[in-house]
Design a protein with these regions (language model features):
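Short hydrophobic/aromatic-enriched beta-strand-loop microsegments
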Residues: 32, 162-164
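Anionic, Ser/Thr-rich low-complexity intrinsically disordered regions
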Residues: 50, 58-60, 73-77, 83-103, ...
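Short, function-defining helix-loop hinge/capping sites that tune catalysis or transport
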Residues: 41-43, 134, 157
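Short, amphipathic alpha-helical segments that act as regulatory/interfacial helices
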Residues: 69-73, 134
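Short, well-structured N-terminal submotif of metal-dependent ribonuclease cores
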Residues: 1-67, 75-87
Length: 164
């Protein structure tokens, strides 16, 4: 079972910060948003897979696992996945969850979701991801948000986060 936070999230030192390679930016936190995980699991997106498999311990919202599991179910029902491919995707999702730091959807996150974001409109579930990243308590410069969603990408950049 993945670790769940009770309140404020851990600092960079406790979630796997690494010394930067020469000429690279320091990334203390890598937040994996649902679209990137789904892209890695179902589309085998090489860039998403690389980001998700980074040596930096990934952080994500508890919401991510519900969204990814639903995407797997939808793909199977639409016959875009064989039963074997569905089982493989579910196993990969479970492996990812075991190595993640999972952030609960707290009252603070939900309160933030109610306020405007820099680039509107933002869908509610996307706002939950953005608010979760903000709740980590790290400087935006120390957080990279891994996403395949344009609205999340645009807002993350506007909020000062690095984006992959």
């Amino acid at each position: 079972m993945a670790k769940r936070s009770k309140g404020r999230s851990r600092t960079a030192a406790t979630v796997g910060a690494q010394a930067p390679a020469p000429d690279s930016a320091l990334v203390a936190v890598r937040y994996i948003e649902s679209s990137a995980l789904v892209s890695a699991l179902l589309e085998r997106d090489a860039d998403a897979l690389k980001s998700i498999r980074s040596k930096i311990k990934p952080i994500t919202s508890a919401l991510t696992f519900a969204e990814a599991a639903r995407a797997i179910v939808r793909a199977r029902v639409a016959e875009r996945l064989t039963p074997d491919a569905e089982r493989a995707a579910v196993r990969a999702l479970r492996r990812f969850e075991r190595r993640c730091y999972v952030v609960s959807i707290t009252d603070d996150v939900l309160t933030r979701v109610r306020r405007p974001f820099p680039v509107e409109p933002v869908r509610t579930l996307d706002a939950v991801h953005l608010a979760t990243a903000e709740s980590l308590g790290e400087l935006p410069q120390l957080i990279t948000i891994v996403t395949r969603d344009d609205r999340v990408r645009d807002n993350a950049k506007a909020l000062g986060y690095s984006v992959e």
